[in-house]
Each structure stands twice: as structure tokens, then as C-alpha cells.
Amino acid sequence: MAFLLHQARFYTTVNHLRDLPPTVQPEIAFAGRSNAGKSTAINVLCNQKRLAFASKTPGRTQHINYFSVGPAAEPVANLVDLPGYGYAEVPGAAKAHWEMLLSTYLATRSQLCGLILMMDSRRPLTELDRRMIEWFAPTGKPIHTLLTKCDKLTRQESINALRTTQKGLDAYRDQGVQGKLTVQLFSALKRTGLDEAHALIESWVRPSVADEKNEPVAQ
């Protein structure tokens, strides 16, 4: 999947659900709080410096950005960069637009095959992170959490963050969530967890290929 993601390019930007492209390829959504490192993670995963852009004013970007991956003539999937959330200075109208846009997209988009949820490893599972899970979990599709910026933690702090997040996800399973809920440590700066994330994304987009390679998938 590393080579597949490295063939990523900008496809389109939409600001309303009615403008979502009528594509047939599977989609993988990337979501996370403002300043959780979402754009940086997408760029590192795709081995590009400026594919995804972070807004100069965190939380102000309210668009959905699509990136196609695979051969340009026959893309095999789309990466979907969702607006960042949780920034205190965002006006109320923008917050309402964000909530409608994301909740409806996550709950109803048939092409969506999984959600990559970025959480700052220093403060995982905020209220808004949980809201994202609760919007998407009823679909039964998988959610994989990247605990970003783990290079800022000590080894023990990283272990604690992973355990705390896993425990929080286990609580959703206990409540009857059927989709897979997995988590890993990730650092764009140190490239920690890059291969693990690539393998998991490939298992979503091309499960038969992943099975043949017997790629490990995060638990």
C-alpha cells in the first residue's frame, strides 16, 4: 500500500453534501481535531510534502478534500480529508455546518469503507473524538485511531496513552459496536507506525491483496 498511497493526487473539494462526487471507488476518511496533525499525517502517508494543507487559522477550513490514489487513469480509492474540529474560535454557524456535513457524510456515504481518526496522543478521546466515533460506529465499518505526535511522549507515556485509548474503545465494543475499533501510535516526524498504518489501509481498500500478503493489521 505504500506504493499505492504514494500515487496520490488532488481530486476535488466540496463544501456541500450535494456536491459529493459520484465516484464508485472505496473511500477512506481522515478526521481529527484541529492541531492533531491530520494534514501532516496524510502527507507522510502519501510521501508528499504539500498534498494536504493545514489552514493557517485552525478550524476555519470547512471543506471536504478528495485525493485519488492509484494510477491516474484508473484510481483504486479516494482519501477524504474531513474538516478539523474543536477549535474554540470557530463561529457558531461554522460549527453547525461542520456538524451537519460530517455527521451526514459519515453516516450515509455508501462508498466510505473506513475512518482514520487522528487523536493527539497527549489528550486522546476528547468529547468531539467520541462524537465522531458515535456518528460512524452504527455503520459497522472499521475505525482506526492514530495517536499522533507520540514522539513528544516518553516510552511509558506512550504505553499509557495506548492503553487508555484501547480501554475507551473497548467500552464501545461492550455497548454493542460491531465494527472493528483499532488503535496505534503514530509520529509523522519520526515516521513511527507508518508501515502499520499503510498495511491497515490496504486491508480496507484491497482486502484480497492484503490477505495474500498476510499483512499484519493493528489490534
UniProtKB/Swiss-Prot annotation:
InterPro entries: G_ENGB_dom, GTP-bd, GTP-bd_ribosome_bio_YsxC, P-loop_NTPase
Superkingdom of origin: Bacteria
EngB-type G domain: residues covered: 24-207
Amino-acid positions noted as binding GTP in the UniProt annotation, renumbered to this chain: 32-39, 59-63, 81-84, 148-151, 186-188
HAMAP family, sorted: GTPase_EngB
Pfam families xrefs: MMR_HSR1
Family of this protein: Belongs to the TRAFAC class TrmE-Era-EngA-EngB-Septin-like GTPase superfamily. EngB GTPase family.
Protein name: Probable GTP-binding protein EngB
Gene: engB
GO biological process, one term: division septum assembly
A GO cellular component entry from the record: cytosol
N-terminal signal peptide: none
Function of the protein: Necessary for normal cell division and for the maintenance of normal septation.
Binding of Mg(2+), residues: 39, 61
Keywords assigned by UniProt, alphabetized: Cell cycle, Cell division, GTP-binding, Magnesium, Metal-binding, Nucleotide-binding, Septation
Annotated coiled-coil segments of the chain: none
One of the record's GO molecular function terms: metal ion binding
Cofactor: Mg(2+)
